[in-house]
Amino acid sequence: RVTSPVRKGITMEWFQAALDRYKQQHHQGHAAPKPERTHSMRSVPAPIVYTRTRSVQVPEPVLREQRIMAGFDAGPFVDAFKILRTQVMHRIREKGWNVIGVTSPGEQEGKTFTAVNLAASIAMDVTQSVLLVDANLRHPSVHEMFDLGECQGLADYLLDDVPIEQLLVHPGIGRFVFLPGGRTVSHSAEALTSPKMLALVEECKHRYQSRMILFDLPPILQTSDV
């Protein structure tokens, strides 16, 4: 079982207010004009050449449509996740953690949106690398955030022994790699509590101590998976 150090209060009231302002601008179609791009505007580190990981260059229009912060230069939406990153990183360094989970009470409450953007914001720090694991095997959706079709992932590793190296995806954002959920698994609680899953979590924790591991978990009140 993955225990998340991210608590309800860590986002703070202004974080929700910033997201509300962004959503209002987004829906009304009055977003601030996009400034001219310069190399100094973003804190994205230099690209890494991934030789063993599948690399997919997600177009910027897709990032913007899906509200992934790497597609934006500035604004309250970007600032909100940068400060959430600061709060989370401070807490996990204080506790000595490198694995965290993101969940929600129910479905359609923005947990995958939050997990992807938190991972992206951490990966845009030149000193950090991030692995995001889609562990919501009943409804895997991290790959959909990047407009990718159905692909193999965690379920295929757990059930069919497909090597992890063949499943990882680099979406062209800093030092960000994600493991898709793969095919839908109806009895996901058994898969997520299997010895193989526990071994994977332990390996991630100890083999990649300099990398942050985020798990996009199932809703906490609707299934027995978390």
Regions found by a protein language model. Give the residues of each.
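P-loop NTP-binding module
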Residues: R1-V226
